[in-house]
Amino acid sequence: MEVKTFAFLQIAVLIALGLHLAPAGSNQLSGPQSSANSNEAVFCDTNCTQGTDEAWSGCRGDCFCVYVGNSTEGRCMMLSGDFDYSTPGAED
């Protein structure tokens, strides 16, 4: 009985300490993970499919196709933010 009570009190103290320390972080935006440097992924209104030639079709504009595993159907998605996915030498 004493062991269960002691274990319960230890857990209660750890939970209380965790709840107390959680909001103790800084309120300033800094570092590479801050929302000032964040990117956003948004699903477009269209779906996409993979044809027999293994090319994906159905996405328009800045949208591209995302799919799971070996599926031949996917959703169109658009990324907004500061991305630089250029291939070295592709613009030569």
Curated annotation (Swiss-Prot):
Disulfide bonds listed in the record: C44-C63, C48-C65, C59-C76
Q: Which residues form the signal peptide?
A: 1-26
- The answer to whether keyword Signal applies is yes
Coarsely, its chief localization is secreted
Tell me which GO cellular component terms the UniProt record holds: extracellular region
Q: Where in the cell is it found?
A: Secreted
Which residues carry attached sugars according to the database record? N47, N70
* Entry superkingdom: Eukaryota
Could you cite one Gene Ontology molecular function of this protein?
A: C-X-C chemokine binding
Record's keyword annotation contains Protein biosynthesis = no
Which keywords, in A-to-Z order, does the entry hold? Disulfide bond, Glycoprotein, Secreted, Signal
Q: What does this protein do?
A: Salivary chemokine-binding protein which binds to host chemokines CXCL1, CXCL2, CXCL3, CXCL4, CXCL5, CXCL6, CXCL10, CXCL11 and CXCL13.
What is this protein identified as?
Evasin P942
Q: Which organism is it from?
A: Ixodes ricinus (Common tick)
